[in-house]
Amino acid sequence: MISYPFFSLSPPGLVPPPMAVPPVEMYSGSFWNRMRKPLPLRTQVIRFTVVFVIVSFILAVALQITHERMPDPKVTKPLPDLGFELLTKISFLSVVTDVLIAFLSLLSFFTLWKLYLLHRHCVGSGEPELPCNIPGVSRFFLSVWLCKENCRIELRNIHTIAWIRFITSYALLLLFRSLVIVMTSMPTPVDKCQDPPKIENPVKNVILTVLTAGGGSIHCGDLMVSGHTVILTLHLMFHWIYGAMVHWSFRPVVTVVAIFSYYCIVASRSHYTDDVLVAIYLTIATFIAVGHNADGAPWQLQLFIRWLPCCGANSREVTEDSQPVMVAFKSEAVDELRERDDSAGLSGEVSTNEV
C-alpha cells in the first residue's frame, strides 16, 4: 500500500496511514498544551510590569546608542517633510505635548480605579469607604460609574485585564522602537539637538531615562516611531474601549486631546510626520492584536513570563473573588432507606453528606 502524508490528498477509499493524525490531536495533553494554560491574572500583572521595567532599560540603552550614532547636524540637514512645510514651527508646543500626556496619564489611572470599583460592584464587595467622610470627594472618587450604553464587557477582573493589555502593548512597542532607532540614524529636526550635548556618565543617563521617562536625560536622534505618539495613542485606545464604560465623555475628550497632541509634535519639530503616522498605526494594531481576554494576555506572550522564578504562582487556584458553590448529589440508596422508614412507620431522619 502507498502511504500518503496526512496533509496530502489520497485516492477515494484509501485508508489513511496511522501517522495521519491532526496536529491538534497529536499534541493533546503535551508540553504545548501545558504552555497554553493561562497564568493567574495577578501573576501576569506583576510579571508583565517587571518585563516593562526591563524593556525600559533596554530602550534607555538604545537611546544612548542612537545619540552617539546621530549624524552631525552641522553637516546633515533635516529631511524634507510635508508636515513641516504645511505647519508653522512653534517650538514651545513640545512642552504642551508633555503636559497633555501627563493629563491623559492621570485620566487613565482614574479610569483604571473606576474599573476596579466596577469589579468590586460585580463581585458584590460594595464601595470602599474613607476613614473620614468628605461628601464631594467620597462621591467623586469612591462611587461606581457605569455607562450602560458602552458596557459590553464582563466586569469581573476588568481592571486587571485592562492593565495587562495596556502594559503588554506598551512593552512590545517600546521593544520594537529600541530596535528601530538603532538600525537607522536620521538627521534630527529638534532645536535642542542641533548642538547635541556630550553624555559624560552613560550609566547615570540610562537610570535618569528610566526614572524620568526620558524627560531628565540626554538623548537625540530617536526619531522613527515617536515615543510621545505611542503613549498618546495607547491612552486613546484605552479610553476608547474602557473609558467609555466609565463615562460617555471620555471618548470625545481624549480623542480631541490626542489629535491636538499629534499636531503639537509635528509643529514643534520634535518628530518627522512619518514618525507620528507610523507610531499611530503600530500602536492601534498592537492594542487590537493583544485584545481583551478573560485569561489576560495571549498565551504566546505569557510564554515569556512563565520562566520567571518569582512574582506569583504559575498555576491557578481559588481566587479571592470566586464565589463558593455547593453541589448536592442525590443518592438512590438514601431514597430507598427513606421509603423503608416510611413503610415501617419510622420517624427518624437520614442525614446526607454535602459535597
From Swiss-Prot:
Gene Ontology molecular function terms on file: ceramide cholinephosphotransferase activity; kinase activity; sphingomyelin synthase activity
Domain of life: Eukaryota
Stretches assigned to the Cytoplasmic side: 1-44, 111-165, 227-229, 297-355
Membrane topology type: Multi-pass membrane protein
UniProt subcellular location: Membrane
Entry annotated with the keyword Transferase: yes
Transmembrane feature ranges: 45-65, 90-110, 166-186, 206-226, 230-250, 276-296
Main location: membrane
Description of the deletion phenotype: Elevated ceramide levels and growth arrest; cells were arrested in division but replication of DNA and organelles continued giving rise to cells containing multiple nuclei, kinetoplasts and flagella.
Pfam families cross-referenced by the UniProt entry: PAP2_C
Keyword vocabulary terms for this entry: Kinase, Lipid metabolism, Membrane, Sphingolipid metabolism, Transferase, Transmembrane, Transmembrane helix
Cell wall biogenesis/degradation recorded as keyword: no
Catalytic activity: an N-acylsphinganine + a 1,2-diacyl-sn-glycero-3-phospho-(1D-myo-inositol) = an N-acylsphinganine-(1D-myo-inositol) + a 1,2-diacyl-sn-glycerol; a 1,2-diacyl-sn-glycero-3-phospho-(1D-myo-inositol) + an N-acylsphing-4-enine = an N-acylsphing-4-enine-(1D-myo-inositol) + a 1,2-diacyl-sn-glycerol; an N-acylsphing-4-enine + a 1,2-diacyl-sn-glycero-3-phosphocholine = a sphingomyelin + a 1,2-diacyl-sn-glycerol; an N-acylsphinganine + a 1,2-diacyl-sn-glycero-3-phosphocholine = an N-acylsphinganine-1-phosphocholine + a 1,2-diacyl-sn-glycerol
Function: Predominantly synthesizes inositol phosphorylceramide (IPC), with minimal sphingomyelin (SM)/ethanolamine phosphorylceramide (EPC) synthase activity. Specificity is likely to be defined by residues in the lumenal catalytic domain that interact with the polar head groups of the phospholipid donors. IPC is synthesized by transferring the phosphoinositol from a 1,2-diacyl-sn-glycero-3-phospho-(1D-myo-inositol) to an N-acylsphing-4-enine (ceramide) or an N-acylsphinganine (dihydroceramide).
Sequence similarity: Belongs to the sphingomyelin synthase family.
Protein name: Phosphatidylinositol:ceramide inositolphosphotransferase
Organism, as annotated: Trypanosoma brucei brucei
Name of the coding gene: SLS1
